[in-house]
Amino acid sequence: MNKSYKILLTGSVIAIGAMGLMANSINSREAERKEINTGPVVQAEGVASKNEEWYRYYPREYDSWKQTKKSDKITDLLREKPQLAIIWAGYGFAKDYNAPRGHFYAIQDNINTLRTGAPTGPSNGPMPTACWTCKSPDVPRLMDEVGENEFFTGKWAKYGNQIVNPIGCADCHNSQTGNLGFSRPHLGRALEASGVNLDEITFQDMRTLVCAQCHVEYYFRPTEWTDKTGKTKTAKVVTLPWAKGLSAENMEEYYDEYSFKDWTHKISKAPMLKAQHPGYELFSKGIHAQNGVSCADCHMPYKQQGSIKYTDHNIGNPLDDIASTCLTCHRDSEKAFRDRVASKLERKEQLMKMAMDTLAAAHLEAGKAWELGATEAEMQPVLELLRSGQWLWDYSIASHGSFFHSPEETLRLLGVANDKGGKARIKLAAILAQHGLIGYQVPDFSTKEKAQALAGVPLQKLITEKKAFESTLLEQWNEEAVKAGRLDPKTLEGMSNKSSWSQTELSQ
């Protein structure tokens, strides 16, 4: 009996000890969880724009964010879809347009693209400061320091030595609390203009709306203001055209009311609109949004590390981690689900190509009509169809994921776009016939080189100028940013440097 008692006592002591160790481990992990999720003060005031400053409190999120570095492939969409160079003739996208890469490359891609030109100083170049708006947490830092209107005044090169950290923590999180928040004022204004009560926004809403700060349609609205010295200036303020609603037709009506145009088409002379990336607007019309699914649910799934649950910040294609994203709700096999997505993409690609071929041919036919002496009165109905049809086409595909976020709306828009382009071509055939030309065959635009030549893009000149810029002013920007403590050069280690035009040179 005594022996049994001793065995029981020993076992009890061991069990109690094990339970104590387990409790200590659980308490330790619980304390860690609370520390990470309490929302520590990363910076007492202002905006903590250097992403590495957030690592201390959010190591898992930061390490996963750095994985966006792996998404470094350059896909030259002008080479894959040469119709684009015709469709955008006279606009920057005819020079250079690539598929999106990881957030880690946001600054590099903005600098490398031929669209931003080759400035030689802070006050020249083709683009305004607004072209930095969605590329860096340095943007809200600067808005906080100099004011929104001052930020939006001047040329892109004005802030080359200031905006140096790629899309990261402070773009979506408040530096004082760590909570999700709007770092770009244009979104709050647009939501209110569209009838949203900002006080009623939920945490789940925010898991989409922080993305909507940038994945939206916008334009640069000229805004006069007076600085502290009394000088009148004009800012090009990022504005979301949501006052009439979030559909493509609502925004077209908004732009028409202001007689707004992004550019005049170089070939057809049509007053054109360029859709940016209306991902949020199209997503809001899809089945996922209607069922309360957020962007983060699919693109930033929760991960588990021990007792710690955190959000994966390796933002990318949900199909790359399908077990943690799509298949948590959809009960298909992985193959069946991938096949379903591929089918949606195939249908979109088919209708998109039809619309692009139609619109590109219509622009070239319009150019020929002008060449033969067509009048403004003859061409006006054609130009209206081209403006509207191309807007609907661009709106439907510019956000890249629209075929999945809102497949029905995407296909509807492509169908209407193709119809309007076709109607423009019918009218143009009649105009050309009236001016003595029947059966006109448009020039071949089947390759990037042929299409850019027709669009008047001096590609080699643009590349030469960009290379000169990168070996002079860009190096100066980086040196100044490092010296001022705005950029830690260690964050650039192991980073590839790619562009579509450097790949073009290598292939020649």
UniProtKB/Swiss-Prot annotation:
Protein residues bound to heme c 4: 295, 298-299, 405
Cross-referenced Gene3D superfamilies: Butyryl-CoA Dehydrogenase, subunit A, domain 3 (1.20.140.10), Flavocytochrome C3, Chain A (1.10.1130.10)
Reactions catalysed, as given in the entry: 6 Fe(III)-[cytochrome c] + NH4(+) + 2 H2O = 6 Fe(II)-[cytochrome c] + nitrite + 8 H(+)
Required co-factors: Ca(2+); heme c
Gene Ontology annotations of biological process type: anaerobic electron transport chain; nitrate assimilation
Alphabetic keyword roster: Calcium, Electron transport, Heme, Iron, Metal-binding, Oxidoreductase, Periplasm, Signal, Transport
EC number(s) reported in the record: 1.7.2.2
N-terminal signal peptide: 1-23
Family label: Belongs to the cytochrome c-552 family.
PANTHER family attached to this UniProt entry: CYTOCHROME C-552, CYTOCHROME C-552 RESPIRATORY NITRITE REDUCTASE
Role, per record: Catalyzes the reduction of nitrite to ammonia, consuming six electrons in the process.
CDD domains named in the record: NrfA-like
Residues that bind heme c 3: 103, 211, 214-215
Example of a GO cellular component annotation carried by this entry: outer membrane-bounded periplasmic space
Annotated positions binding heme c 5: 288, 326, 329-330
Cellular localization per UniProt: Periplasm
Name of the protein in its database record: Cytochrome c-552
MF terms in GO: calcium ion binding; heme binding; nitrite reductase (cytochrome, ammonia-forming) activity
Binding note for cofactor: Binds 1 Ca(2+) ion per monomer.
Pathway: Nitrogen metabolism; nitrate reduction (assimilation)
UniProt main location, coarse: periplasm
Domain of life: Bacteria
Protein residues bound to heme: 131, 134-135
Binding site for Ca(2+): 217-218, 274, 276
Binding sites annotated in the UniProt record for heme c 2: 169, 172-173, 313
Chain segments carrying region Disordered: 485-508
